[in-house]
Every structure is written in structure tokens, then in C-alpha cells.
UniProtKB/Swiss-Prot annotation:
Entry-linked HAMAP family: UPF0262
Organism: Jannaschia sp. (strain CCS1)
The protein's name: UPF0262 protein Jann_2882
InterPro entries for this protein: UCP032146
Recorded superkingdom: Bacteria
Recorded coiled-coil stretches: none
Length: 156
């Protein structure tokens, strides 16, 4: 089956996350491992499941992919530049959401959450575009990976 069976986030050199960011990371990893679709499209690529390591190195997002038994499957680097504005917008709306949960009525929280989901969907769409030809992922997998990119980008 073509999916991610293990994920590691390389936070070496990044500041410690806030409790909210750590919670976002934990939820995204849990949800991702519960259900995801991840395929390496080139015909000579080993089949999954895959172990994925995400890192930021030299201002680039690094996907390091191994097979379940540890054999190298692929590695590719994506520029962070196309993600910067969407990540920034996502964290701004997340801050508003975290504040709203503490003091606003449910109707206002729902409005902020809808905006947050919209930005999240945009980030997922952008990630799917950037991965074209490198990896094929479904929308839910893209959303969860985008969350992890945001977590990494926050500290970078």
C-alpha cells in the first residue's frame, strides 16, 4: 500500500515550539499516520509504505523518504518561498483562533475557523502543485503535511 507509515520532523536548530504549535504538530502527525495517500510516481521508485523525514535545510523544505525497511526511496527539496505568505496568513489566523476560543461566542469562533480552513486548503493545494511529478498525495494528506510545514516554518 502506498502511504506514509512513519513521520519524523527534524527540528534541530529550531526554537522550542509553543504549546499551541506542539499540539498542532501532534494532531497533524496522528491524523496523517491514521490515514494518508502518498505515492512516488516514477516507475523505478520502490513501493511503500514509506518513512518520511521533513526538515528545513538552507531555506529549503526537504522530503527524505525511505521504504518501511529503511532503504532510500527518494529525496527532494522544495523552495519555501512559494509557501511564505500562506504560512504567515495561516499562523495569523491560528493566533486569532486560539485567542477567540478563550473569549468569543461560538458563532464568531466558527467564522474564524472557516477562514482558517480556507487558508489551510490553499496551503494544501499549493503543496500538491509543488509536489507534482515528485509525489502524489490526496487533499487530506496535503492538509496534514501543510500543517507540519507550518510547524517547521514557524521555527525557521
Amino acid at each position: 500500500m502506498m502511504h506514509i507509515c512513519h513521520i519524523e520532523i527534524d527540528t534541530q536548530g529550531l526554537p522550542a515550539p509553543t504549546p499551541e504549535i506542539e499540539q498542532e504538530r501532534k494532531v497533524a502527525i496522528f491524523d496523517l499516520l491514521e490515514e494518508n495517500t502518498f505515492t512516488l510516481p516514477h516507475e523505478d521508485a520502490p513501493s511503500g509504505p514509506y518513512r518520511l523525514s521533513l526538515a528545513i535545510r538552507e531555506k529549503r523544505l526537504v522530503f527524505d523518504i525511505d521504504t518501511e525497511d529503511g532503504a532510500e526511496a527518494a529525496e527532494f527539496h522544495l523552495s519555501l518561498a512559494p509557501f511564505r505568505q500562506t504560512v504567515k496568513d495561516y499562523w495569523q489566523i491560528c493566533e486569532a483562533y486560539f485567542d477567540a476560543v478563550k473569549k468569543l461566542p461560538p458563532s464568531q469562533i466558527e467564522a474564524i475557523d472557516m477562514a482558517r480552513r480556507g487558508i489551510h486548503n490553499e496551503g494544501a493545494r499549493l503543496l500538491q502543485e509543488r509536489l507534482e511529478g515528485k509525489a502524489e498525495i490526496d487533499t487530506d494528506t496535503a492538509r496534514r503535511l501543510f500543517t507540519l510545514i507550518c510547524v517547521l516554518h514557524f521555527g525557521a
